């Protein structure tokens, strides 16, 4: 990306090359990629970048920004200071000002995942409850394990002390060779039994 700089101020941002007119002179889009940094600087075109521009929306909201124009390097850097979302809910459910916190959102995701994992065998549980064939042992064990895991995940979310702790629950770590070291707590679901594959 590039910025038009005049008198130390950014007057335009160009996310992609485009034909532009500067001081009455038309320049083709090719100047952005074909010209040297010094040639672009001579007409006020600086390299432009943003730092922390796209925070993980699950945990952060975009805060304020600071733009630094470096005339000697012909660069413009806009740095965003992202703000952690509230971990706890704000307001009360049903109120206009209610907003679910990060923990509520993460626990809802766990519930949805657990429901999805159980959905394929729900018919077996319903059939057994209505007096039909019993749920196969491996499937019953799996269903219980999914519910237990879901409950332990929600407890882990509730026990997280800050945003970094919540993020850590959903972060798998890897060895240098790319193999999994530790599966993230919120991704460590029971193995699906053969009867459901």
Range-by-range predicted roles:
Residues 1-197:
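A preference for well-ordered globular domain cores
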């Amino acid at each position: 990306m590039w910025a038009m700089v005049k008198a130390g101020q950014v007057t335009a941002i160009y996310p992609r090359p485009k034909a532009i007119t500067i001081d009455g002179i038309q320049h083709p889009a090719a100047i952005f990629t074909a010209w040297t940094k010094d040639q672009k600087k001579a007409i006020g075109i600086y390299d432009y970048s943003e730092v922390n521009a796209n925070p993980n929306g699950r945990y952060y909201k975009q805060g304020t920004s600071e733009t630094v124009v470096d005339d000697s390097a012909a660069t413009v850097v806009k740095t965003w200071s992202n703000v952690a979302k509230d971990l706890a809910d704000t307001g009360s459910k049903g109120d206009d000002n209610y907003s679910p916190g990060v923990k509520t959102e993460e626990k809802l995701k766990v519930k949805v995942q657990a429901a999805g994992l159980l959905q394929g065998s729900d018919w077996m549980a319903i059939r057994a409850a209505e007096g039909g064939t019993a749920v196969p042992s491996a499937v019953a064990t799996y269903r219980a394990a999914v519910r237990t895991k879901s409950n332990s995940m929600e407890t882990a979310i509730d026990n997280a002390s800050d945003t970094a702790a919540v993020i850590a629950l959903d972060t798998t770590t890897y060895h240098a060779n790319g193999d999994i070291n530790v599966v993230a707590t919120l991704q460590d679901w029971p193995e699906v039994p053969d009867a459901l594959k």
